[in-house]
C-alpha cells in the first residue's frame, strides 16, 4: 500500500512539474511573440517618422527627439503587453523619453553619426533633409526599444531610471552591424525617394 501511495505521489509530482514546465514554456513563447509584435510596431513608426521629417524638415535638430517619439506608438506598444494607456499618459511618457534623448546627447550624437555616413553619397541640397529624416527614424527606433523594455518590466524603468534604459538601447543601436543594417534600409526607404523627387524637379 505504501509503495502504491508513493508511486501515485511521484506520478502526481511529475505531472505537476510537467505542467509548470509547460506553463513556463507558454509564458516564454508569449513573451517572445509580444516582443516580436512590439518590434513590428516600432519598425512601422520608425519609417513613418523618417518619411514625415524628411518631407518637412524641422527648424532645429534639438526638436528631433520630440518629433521622433510618437504617443500613438507608445499606446500601441503598451497594448501588445495588455496595458491600456490614456492618451495623456502616453504623451507624458513620449515627452519624457524625448527629453531624455536630447539630455543624454543622443539626438546630436545620432545626427553626427548619420550625417557622416550620408555625406559621402549625397549632394549638399539633399543632405540636410536626408540626415534629419534618417536620424528621426533612428531615434524612434531607440525610443521604441526603450518602451518595449519599460512595458516588459511592468511599467518600471529599473534602478537606473529612464536614462539607463535609453542609453543602453542607444549603445546597442550604434553598434557596427545594427547601424549598418539600419542605414542600408534607410538609404532604400528615405534617401532614394528623396533623390528621385529631386531628379523630377530638374528642368
Predicted segments with their positions:
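Hydrophobic alpha-helical transmembrane segments and adjacent short intramembrane/lumenal linkers
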Residues: 79-118, 125-129
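Transmembrane alpha-helical segments and their cytosolic interface motifs
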Residues: 30-69, 95-107
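Short hydrophobic membrane-inserting alpha-helices and related fusion/pore-forming segments
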Residues: 51-64, 111-135
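Short, mixed-charge aromatic SLiMs
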Residues: 24, 93-103, 162-175
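Acidic, carboxylate-rich catalytic segments that either coordinate divalent cations
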Residues: 132, 144, 148-203
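C-terminal end of P-loop GTPase domains and the immediately downstream helical coupling element
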Residues: 1-46
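Conserved, well-folded catalytic cores of nucleic-acid-processing
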Residues: 5, 77-80, 100, 104, ...
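Membrane-interface alpha-helices
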Residues: 65-94, 132-157
Amino acid at each position: 500500500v505504501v509503495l502504491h501511495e508513493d508511486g501515485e505521489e511521484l506520478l502526481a509530482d511529475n505531472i505537476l512539474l510537467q505542467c509548470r514546465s509547460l506553463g513556463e514554456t507558454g509564458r516564454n513563447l508569449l513573451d517572445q511573440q509580444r516582443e516580436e509584435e512590439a518590434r513590428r510596431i516600432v519598425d512601422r513608426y520608425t519609417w513613418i517618422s523618417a518619411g514625415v521629417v524628411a518631407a518637412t524638415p524641422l527648424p532645429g535638430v534639438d526638436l528631433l527627439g520630440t518629433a521622433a517619439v510618437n504617443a500613438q506608438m507608445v499606446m500601441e506598444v503598451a497594448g501588445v503587453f495588455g496595458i491600456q494607456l490614456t492618451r495623456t499618459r502616453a504623451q507624458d511618457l513620449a515627452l519624457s523619453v524625448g527629453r531624455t534623448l536630447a539630455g543624454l546627447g543622443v539626438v546630436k550624437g545620432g545626427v553626427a553619426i548619420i550625417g557622416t555616413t550620408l555625406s559621402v553619397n549625397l549632394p549638399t541640397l539633399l543632405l540636410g533633409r536626408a540626415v534629419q529624416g534618417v536620424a528621426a527614424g533612428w531615434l524612434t527606433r531607440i525610443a521604441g526599444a526603450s518602451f518595449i523594455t519599460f512595458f516588459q518590466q511592468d511599467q518600471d524603468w529599473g534602478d537606473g531610471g529612464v536614462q539607463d534604459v535609453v542609453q543602453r538601447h542607444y549603445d546597442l543601436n550604434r553598434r557596427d552591424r545594427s547601424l549598418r543594417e539600419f542605414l542600408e534600409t534607410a538609404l532604400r526607404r528615405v534617401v532614394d525617394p528623396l533623390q528621385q523627387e529631386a531628379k523630377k524637379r530638374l528642368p
